[in-house]
Amino acid sequence: MDRFVSTYTMRLDAKGRVSIPAPYRTVLAKDGTDLLHCHPSLAEPALDAGGTSLMAEIEALIARYPPYSEAREELAAALYGTTEMLRIDPEGRVVLTESLKTHAAIADQVTFVGLGHKFRIWEPERFRAHLAEAREKVRQLRRSLGSGSGNEGSISG
């Protein structure tokens, strides 16, 4: 299965378009879509994005709850209700809507971060801060598991 991996920082052009990194476009094409499904992250001041596989995962998550239950309605509103279907143009670009840009505080640059089954779109400075915090949490986790090897920059040690 193809995955979204690596990190890329790209500029928005004068028309507000941003190029999706070529490796990510390849994954989306193999997923059988020319649309980018994008919604405000539920966990971070960033955007979650992906193709039909991401939408299938969202559907599976929502389907765990009984129809018309409060939890199902809230998840559906938070995920389906805020997902934008962005058309990918022939040059591999999308236009982020104002509501998406506002949620993630995006102005003229974005950082794409692969998360395997999906990717996240960040304002670059916010991502740098998030990554520093995430690395510290991983170091603490490794120490708590007794796997600190002195090589704290590597997950595998």
From Swiss-Prot:
- Outline the extent of the SpoVT-AbrB domain: 7-54, 83-126
Q: What is the annotated localization of this protein? A: Cytoplasm, Nucleoid
Q: Which UniProt keywords apply?
A: Cytoplasm, DNA-binding, Repeat, Transcription, Transcription regulation
Give GO terms: molecular function aspect only: DNA-binding transcription factor activity; transcription cis-regulatory region binding
Entries under InterPro entries matching the protein? MraZ (IPR003444), MraZ_C (IPR035644), MraZ_dom (IPR020603), MraZ_N (IPR035642), MraZ_sf (IPR038619), SpoVT-AbrB_dom (IPR007159), SpoVT-AbrB_sf (IPR037914)
Q: Does the keyword Nucleotide-binding apply?
A: no
Is Nucleotidyltransferase tagged as a keyword?
no
GO biological process, alphabetically ordered = negative regulation of DNA-templated transcription initiation
Q: Which GO terms describe its cellular component?
A: cytoplasm; nucleoid
One Pfam short name? MraZ
Quaternary structure, from the entry: Forms oligomers.
Q: To which protein family does this belong? A: Belongs to the MraZ family.
Q: What is this protein called?
A: Transcriptional regulator MraZ
Whose protein is this, by species? Azorhizobium caulinodans (strain ATCC 43989 / DSM 5975 / JCM 20966 / LMG 6465 / NBRC 14845 / NCIMB 13405 / ORS 571)
Gene name in the database record: mraZ
